[in-house]
Structures are given as structure tokens and as C-alpha cells.
Amino acid sequence: MAYRIAIVGGGLGGLTAALLLSRSGHEVTLLEQAMSFRTEGAGIQLSPNASRVLERLGLGPTLAARATATTRSRFRHFRTGRTITEAVLGERAAMRYGAPYWQIHRADLHGALQEAAEATPGLSVHLGQAVRHDEIIHQGDQLSVTPVPGPFDCVIGADGIHSQVRRWCFGAAPSRFTGQVAWRFLVDSAALPSALKAPESQVWWGPGAHFVHYPVAQGRWVNCVAVQEAREWTEESWSLPGEPGALRSAFEGWHADVQALTHHAEEATLFKWGLFDRRPLPSWHRGPVTLLGDACHPTLPFLAQGAAMAIEDAATLNLALTRFPSLEEALSRYEGWRRPRTTRIQRTSRRYGWVYHLGAPIAWFRDRAAPLARARTMDWLYRYDPEAPDQA
């Protein structure tokens, strides 16, 4: 059965869902509050569980031309630089998991999805259309979203951690500060030694903090994310400018590679934000209205799975809406398929945030357990196919 679907939110999950659902024969209207699609942001790690969905959308060649193929992921000691554990990726990962591991700038990925959306018949995109929770009207069999003509059969909230659609479904829910703040910034690779430009992800573990970096934009930039423990934070935002001096001070005494990156941070790209968490929702849908991505299961960044979870959600939701004749059954099956995995990833990410920041002497035991734990986690994460959830 073909549905009339409104998707609120034009981020990575919303655009992926719009493309998949349109190509499955549904009539899709995408509502994005911004006047233009985002071009800011920083890097994203696209692991095989997400890249397989994008390849099936036909975006493989476009993304391969814009992304960096990750050769390995290394975890290092914050001061000595010693490699604690590493995972070989590249062709080996593509063969093992059936899809590539890419590092890509958010704007490059978003641009590829936007270009595909513009070329997709039956997909209507409305920019500058913010949706408030009180603008979703469900009376009897009629479902409408005030900013655009309806009616719709289904509304999908892909509008992020501050989701208005989630508020319509379940009311306002407070978020919890995790006690961690993060910086993100880009570094011009021309200013760096060759060791810092290698096509790999490096994660430095230190007491009370960690630091991640990898190249994006075909190696023109190195994307950096640094996380440090903090007592309080008053904003839940990605848009607060960071202070270069505070960043350098936070990682003073770390390995020379980390300090080289903090000293070459492009100030215009430096932002700081608090990491917030929410408890898993009791349900993901209310009537014909459902959620995906951060709107229903915001994920801390320690597994690099936030974008991947939204992309997986989109693929599984499309499968459910295409396979089952009843909308209620489709939304219930979508939730039933996805909830165990996303809840596990939320909990594992929280735990990794603690593990990454361990100090001596317990860090000694962590370092010796890391190789086996990392291999098990990678297999569970990356083998997953969101379009075959019965086999998970």
C-alpha cells in the first residue's frame, strides 16, 4: 500500500528515509526548518552497517569520490603515543562486512543525499518549514501538519534531539547532562606532518578525556573531536563557539601529535557543546506518528554510530511500511526490530564514555582487554543489515 507521508526534519536520517520511501512508491513530503540544507558541520564516520544502505540507494560512486576510505582505527595512549589496540579496515573490512568504512565531511554526505532527493520523482521538499508540536493535528482518520497542505497517512519525526514530533507524541522530556563536554574543529592538512594525514581514525585515551581525529574531504582537512569531563553545562547546542586557548589548555601535556592538532585548529570551525542523554522512550509511535534517529534514541558519540543509527532506522522503517499492509502493524514492527539494537548501542556508548577516560591503575586492565572487546563490538555493529532485521 502506498502512503502519504510527511517527514519532519531534513537531516541525514530524514533525507535517507525520504529517498527510500519515495523509491518504494510512497508520496513523501519533507519539511526542513532551515532555509537551505546544512553545509556546516564536521566529519562523520560511516561504518559498513550504514554505508551498505547508501550504496543500495545508488550513492556509492558519489560518496566514494567525496569520502576517505579508512584503512585502520588506532587507539593510543594519551602521553606516550603507544598503540593500545587497532583494527584493520580498508579492503579487509569491506570484504568482511560487505560494505566500506568511510570518513566523510557532513556537508559532502548531506549534499549527496540532497542531490538524490532533487532527482527523485514523488518527493516534495519544503525548506523554511519549522514544525511545532501543536501544528500536528490528528482527528479521527485525518492527519495534518499545519505548514503544508495535507492530509497525510503518516508523520515521521526526524527532527533531532529537540524533536517537536516527539513532544507531540509523548510530551516534553528533560535531557540529562552526562558530565562531559566536547569540542569539534577542522585542521588544514597542509599544516600537518604526514603521520597526521594518514587515512585512518586515531583515538587517544587519557584520564578524564579523549581525542579523536581523521581526515575528511579527500584529505584536505583533518576532523577533530575532543571530549573532556566537566561539572556543568547550561546549553544543549552544537553552535557555541569554542575558545582556542581553553582547548589547548585542556590537552596540555598530551602527545605532540594531539598538541599539533589543537594548535592548528581553524578557529572559525571550533565549537564546543555539552553531551546530553535521554532515557529510552517507552514507545516510538503514537497512532500514525513515529520517530527515527536522535528524535527517539539520541546516541552519545563514543561508538561513532549516531548518523549510522538514523540511516539504519530509515532503512528498516521503509521495509516495514512496504512489507505490512496495516500502518499500525508496520510501525509496531519497525519499533520492535529497532528498539533492542538502538537501546544496546545507547547503553554501550555510555559505557565507552567511561572506559575511554579511565586513569591508572585500572586503565592498565582496560588496555589489555581492549583488543578482544573491540573485535567483538565491531562484528556486532558492522555485520548488521537494517533491511534484513529478522536475521539480526
Label every model-predicted segment.
Residues P61, S189-K197, W233, D257, ...:
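Short helix-loop capping/hinge motifs at secondary-structure junctions, enriched
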